[in-house]
Amino acid sequence: MLAFPVSRFSIKFQALANIQLPKYAGSTLRGAFGHALKSMACLTASRNKGVCRCEPVERCLYRQLFDPPKKSLKLQDRVQDIAPPFVIEAYSLPEQISKGESATFYTVIIGHFAHQQQMMIQLAWHRALAAGIGQNLSKGGAQSTLIPFPLC
């Protein structure tokens, strides 16, 4: 049986200014992470009005996480959408984080390719928080640690 890697990151940050987040901050964090990752990992987006056109798709970290290629089904004349191989757990974040306060959220990465790129993923989270999150793009200084957990 092949091992299928799943890891959970705990991302703790301290607010450098007051941060106002929506009730569930997952979409906000996903957007900040996506922008940071694209600016680091995609060589084609700056030439294509922000659209990643990296080829082959299988080698592009941004495309693998945010726009996984569809897989052909061998027995049928169809293609299957592939779910993005990461999950953001932001349910523990408050809507208001005051300057100086710390907050924590989690991200889970799934699959071999994402695990080969853990350093890039961590750096993208650092950049996303440094660029700012929330309504006013308030900045936070990031600290992240890898917390692997076994499959059930």
Where are these regions (language model features)?
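RNA-interacting cores
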Residues: 1-152
